[in-house]
């Protein structure tokens, strides 16, 4: 055994062993319990960043732990390979997007392998390959046959910079999610999938996802935006037209002072034909229709249509306003506005000086002159004619009956969720397998002609879509001897990442989209890992696509994933200087050093120009802030295992991780300490005698009990709590105690050996190369990859006792022995039931109990 720990010698050797022996290749095995652990599909951008490393390390730790529990563990990996960056790189570098993508995949695959992740590489998928996306095209045709997809002229979110359509989920604060440029709204022919048909189940089934973060589920509930209410028909004054408007508070209808309609509403288009100022307003605001996120920040702009509707109960006329705070295509695009009791309506009314009528008594100011102040709470009606003094429920029922008699109301459930626009005006994506005849009829490409391949690129320009232009040779084809024009749009790349988890179960299945036997065995995914930024995009599409696959009998169960972890961001220090144009110039942390100025003050300066830098704090690692840390640099300096262990130790997984190289160095020292410990005790490998707890002395029992307590703690932290940082901390404590444990006899050697072997096993999911080699040294070249998780004995812990000092108001009363494995509540219960204690605290009022673990219990009376 080498005296010094040298990761550069160990890690390539171990990785080659895994590759040669196909250690992590798995197959369906009905005799073993399966476990499917999946990190989110990476985009092959060129290089891994620390966010990738954190995501994939979490997944690998869980996978290796579950494998040690004896489960058949599937952990696959692949590439989300279509997308705009490849297209832009192709234009810039005059190369094919496929070549750029494959080059990146090759490099990133090497990086992943250098980190020692236990992937089944035989299942690797690449979404830009025809053998993958041909099934996506096939499935789209099946959806078309079932009328679950359609094409229509629609107002869509248009990114003028990327020159493509964005789904609602891809618009963040009015900007493109990718390039951050302001989006516009335009009307063009687009393909949609009817996700709204599944809105109810997407909403309700969130309740079944018990092991998903509540924050993610709430974000999805808000995005789906289920709202139960009523649709009421209003007659337009002096017209035969009608407007259907929605409300989820029918009890407030007597407080309605205007109707709000969106710029997209057909009535808006109607009145704009005669009034140029309205047309101008619509042209301006249709590009800024409110998204869900924008409502709170919107400026509440609008224009009076100069038209009125008749209130269905009072028969009074109320104005119709075209406003910008109604979400595009929400419900009927028209709402009943009650500014006295709705915040958005109030804001709009105040700005435009509209009438406000209060109809709910404000509970805060009951029986005062202030009872008519604004409130959104449910309450008792007043100022509502025949409905005065009714509560919410009774008022709703009575108003509903009144309007039912007039046949102008129906109950309605509305969703903010819109059908999924999957058309993209880009080259590098999956071609949509549809075509249009000369008479305008849309037909599917015959299944025998799938996959529809992308045309070859011959000339590079600012757009690669020209080979797919409707006038191109590629687009103009014959189907059944009829001239047709292919669809020239490609799929939104979220399509590829919506079903890859199922294809991983059968990547080489060539007679169908999904092998029913394999999917039945492996699905659902037991653990999914990815960032919370995907909550309202990928994770909604992911769940929706699974329900589609289920309804086509391709998978079983209602949901694709049992457990979800959303890891936090990786932060790093950020520094900048102002340049001559007063713009921030971001300085990489490695280029910053500490010096003293002429006054003797400690300052941080740029190594290159020796000028003082400004500290911007801990910020998410990014190219724009020039504060990313290259994983390769850390691997070369400290080894992959050090990086992995630091990533898992530095913070709880759901929290942001602050990158500090001093912490990495500390982890490196810890691993060297363990290596030295094994080296110093390498002779214990000859010991075959098992520890006999009954003959141990006090010192030995203390060490052996600590070992078993650590196994319990680490097992619970990794398996149930997913608290990896505390698991590592417990192992560190055990290592520290073992380091000072003196060997005096054969029993001591047995304890040392069992402790070292258990430590290596517990560290294995975190530092697999390191543990692989140490295990070989202690076990005559045996392979740790097939070892089981260390076990503990309850009888050992039950015999482990500690003496607690019992105090009353700080004065010692007695000492009592308690078992160490008991928690605080169990210890207090045991102590309070002892007769000696009961006598001492009888007739005393206990104010509080102070408990110092394994030392003191103080009753403050």
Curated annotation (Swiss-Prot):
It is an enzyme of class 6 (ligase). It catalyses: tRNA(Leu) + L-leucine + ATP = L-leucyl-tRNA(Leu) + AMP + diphosphate. One of its GO terms (biological process) is leucyl-tRNA aminoacylation. Its EC number is 6.1.1.4. The keyword Glycosyltransferase does not apply. GO terms for cellular component: cytosol. A motif ('KMSKS' region) lies at residues 620-624. Keywords: Aminoacyl-tRNA synthetase, ATP-binding, Cytoplasm, Ligase, Nucleotide-binding, Protein biosynthesis. InterPro entries: aa-tRNA-synth_I_CS (IPR001412), aa-tRNA-synth_Ia (IPR002300), Leu-tRNA-ligase (IPR002302), Leu_tRNA-synth_edit (IPR025709), M/V/L/I-tRNA-synth_anticd-bd (IPR013155), Methionyl/Leucyl_tRNA_Synth (IPR015413), Rossmann-like_a/b/a_fold (IPR014729), tRNAsynth_Ia_anticodon-bd (IPR009080). It is found in: Cytoplasm. Disulfide bonds: none annotated. ATP binds at residue 623. A motif ('HIGH' region) lies at residues 42-52. One of its GO terms (molecular function) is leucine-tRNA ligase activity. Pfam families: Anticodon_1, tRNA-synt_1, tRNA-synt_1_2, tRNA-synt_1g. NCBIfam families: leuS_bact. Belongs to the class-I aminoacyl-tRNA synthetase family. This is Leucine--tRNA ligase. It comes from Buchnera aphidicola subsp. Schizaphis graminum (strain Sg). The gene is leuS.
């Amino acid at each position: 055994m080498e005296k010094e720990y040298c990761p550069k010698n160990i890690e390539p050797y171990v990785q080659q062993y895994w590759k040669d022996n196909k250690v992590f290749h798995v197959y369906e095995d009905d005799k073993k319990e399966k476990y499917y652990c999946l990190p989110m599909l990476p985009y092959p951008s060129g290089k891994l960043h620390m966010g990738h490393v954190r995501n994939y390390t979490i997944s690998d730790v869980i996978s290796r732990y579950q494998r040690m529990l004896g489960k058949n563990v599937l952990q696959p990996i692949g590439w989300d390979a279509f997308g705009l960056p490849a297209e832009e790189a192709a234009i810039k570098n005059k190369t094919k997007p496929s070549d750029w993508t494959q080059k990146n995949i090759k490099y990133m695959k090497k990086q992943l392998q250098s980190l020692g992740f236990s992937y089944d590489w035989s299942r690797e998928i690449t979404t830009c390959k025809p053998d993958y996306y041909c099934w996506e095209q096939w499935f789209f045709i099946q959806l078309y046959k079932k009328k679950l997809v359609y094409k229509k002229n629609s107002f869509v979110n248009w990114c003028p910079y990327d020159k493509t359509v964005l789904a609602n989920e891809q618009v963040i604060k009015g900007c493109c999610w990718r390039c951050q440029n302001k989006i516009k709204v335009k009307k063009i022919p687009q393909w949609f999938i009817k996700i709204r048909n599944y809105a109810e189940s997407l909403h309700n089934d969130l309740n079944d996802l018990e092991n998903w973060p509540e924050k993610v589920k709430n974000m999805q509930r808000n995005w789906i935006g289920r709202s139960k209410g009523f649709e009421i028909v209003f007659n337009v004054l002096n017209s035969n037209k009608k407007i259907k408007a929605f409300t989820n508070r029918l009890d407030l209808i007597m407080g309605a002072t205007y109707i709000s309609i969106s710029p997209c509403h057909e009535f808006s288009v109607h009145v704009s034909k005669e009034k140029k100022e309205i047309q101008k307003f619509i042209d301006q605001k249709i590009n800024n229709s409110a998204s869900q996120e924008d409502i709170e920040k919107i400026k509440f702009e609008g224009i009076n249509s100069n038209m009125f509707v008749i209130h269905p109960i009072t028969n009074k006329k109320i104005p119709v306003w075209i406003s910008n705070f109604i979400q595009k295509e929400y419900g009927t695009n028209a709402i009943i506005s009650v500014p006295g009791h709705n915040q958005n309506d109030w804001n709009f009314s105040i700005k435009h000086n509209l009438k406000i009528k209060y109809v709910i008594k404000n509970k805060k100011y009951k029986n005062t002159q202030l009872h008519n102040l604004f409130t959104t709470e449910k309450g008792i009606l007043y100022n509502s004619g025949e409905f005065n003094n009714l509560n919410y429920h009774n008022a709703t029922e009575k108003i509903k009956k009144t309007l039912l008699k007039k046949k102008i109301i129906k109950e309605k459930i509305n969703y903010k969720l819109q059908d999924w626009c999957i058309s993209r005006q880009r080259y590098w994506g999956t071609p949509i397998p549809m075509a249009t005849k000369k008479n305008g009829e849309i037909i599917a490409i015959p299944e025998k002609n799938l996959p529809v391949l992308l045309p070859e690129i011959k000339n590079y320009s600012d757009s690669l879509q020209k080979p797919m232009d409707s006038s191109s040779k590629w687009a103009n084809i014959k189907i059944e001897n009829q001239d047709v024009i292919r669809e020239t749009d490609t799929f939104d790349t979220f399509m590829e990442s919506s079903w890859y988890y199922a294809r991983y179960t059968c990547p080489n299945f060539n007679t169908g989209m999904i092998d029913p036997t394999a999917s039945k065995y492996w699905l659902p995914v037991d653990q999914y890992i990815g960032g919370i930024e995907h909550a309202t995009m990928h994770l909604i599409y992911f769940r929706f696509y699974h329900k589609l696959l289920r309804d086509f009998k391709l998978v079983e169960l209602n949901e694709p994933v049992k457990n979800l972890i959303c890891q936090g961001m990786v932060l790093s220090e950020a520094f900048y200087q102002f340049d001559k144009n007063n713009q921030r110039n971001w300085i990489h942390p490695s280029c910053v050093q500490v010096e003293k100025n002429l006054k003797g003050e400690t300052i941080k300066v740029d190594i290159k120009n020796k000028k003082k830098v400004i500290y911007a704090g801990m910020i998410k690692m990014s190219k724009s802030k020039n504060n990313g840390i290259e994983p390769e640099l850390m691997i070369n300096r400290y080894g992959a295992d050090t990086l992995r262990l630091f990533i898992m130790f530095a913070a709880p997984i759901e929290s942001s991780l602050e990158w500090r190289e001093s912490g990495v160095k500390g982890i490196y020292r810890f691993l060297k300490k363990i290596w030295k410990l094994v080296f110093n005790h390498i002779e214990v490998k000859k010991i075959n005698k098992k520890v006999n707890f009954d003959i141990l002395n006090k010192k030995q029992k203390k060490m052996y009990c600590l070992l078993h307590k650590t196994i319990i703690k680490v097992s619970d932290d990794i398996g149930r709590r997913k608290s990896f940082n505390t698991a590592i901390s417990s192992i560190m404590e055990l290592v520290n105690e073992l380091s000072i444990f003196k060997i005096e006899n054969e029993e001591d050697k047995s304890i040392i050996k069992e402790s070292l072997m258990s430590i290596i096993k517990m560290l294995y999911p975190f530092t697999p190369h390191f543990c692989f080699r140490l295990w070989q040294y202690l076990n005559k070249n045996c392979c740790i990859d097939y070892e089981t998780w260390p076990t503990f004995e309850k009888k050992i812990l039950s015999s482990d006792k500690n003496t607690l000092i019992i105090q009353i108001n700080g004065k010692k009363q007695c000492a009592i022995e308690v078992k160490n494995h008991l928690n605080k509540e169990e210890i207090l219960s045991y102590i309070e039931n002892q007769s000696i204690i009961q006598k001492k605290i009888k007739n005393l009022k206990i104010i509080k109990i102070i408990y110092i673990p394994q030392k003191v219990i103080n009753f403050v009376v």
